[in-house]
């Protein structure tokens, strides 16, 4: 996984589609969903870490733009 789109496609494999309309909220919900999948041991550590890193980076970029 290298992009937010790839994370969305990854989550879709588990039946999760997230769209609220607020990009930051969408990313935060994706992060929460990934945590749930990881804690349920449905995804591997590497996938979890990579996805969380990408999401947090994107959230930071969006928050910096809003400031």
Can you describe what each PLM-predicted range is?
Residues 15-18, 38, 63:
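Short amphipathic alpha-helical interaction patches enriched in hydrophobic/aromatic residues
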Residues 11, 40-45, 66-67:
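Short, structured secondary-structure boundary patches
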Residues 1-8, 56-67:
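Charged low-complexity stretches with an acidic bias
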Residues 1-24:
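N-terminal acidic leader/helix
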């Amino acid at each position: 996984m290298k992009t937010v789109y790839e994370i969305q496609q990854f989550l879709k494999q588990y039946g999760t589609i997230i769209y609220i309309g607020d990009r930051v909220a969408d990313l935060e919900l994706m992060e929460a969903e990934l945590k749930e999948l990881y804690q349920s041991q449905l995804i591997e550590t590497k996938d979890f870490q990579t996805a969380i890193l990408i999401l947090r980076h994107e959230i930071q970029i969006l928050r910096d733009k809003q400031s």
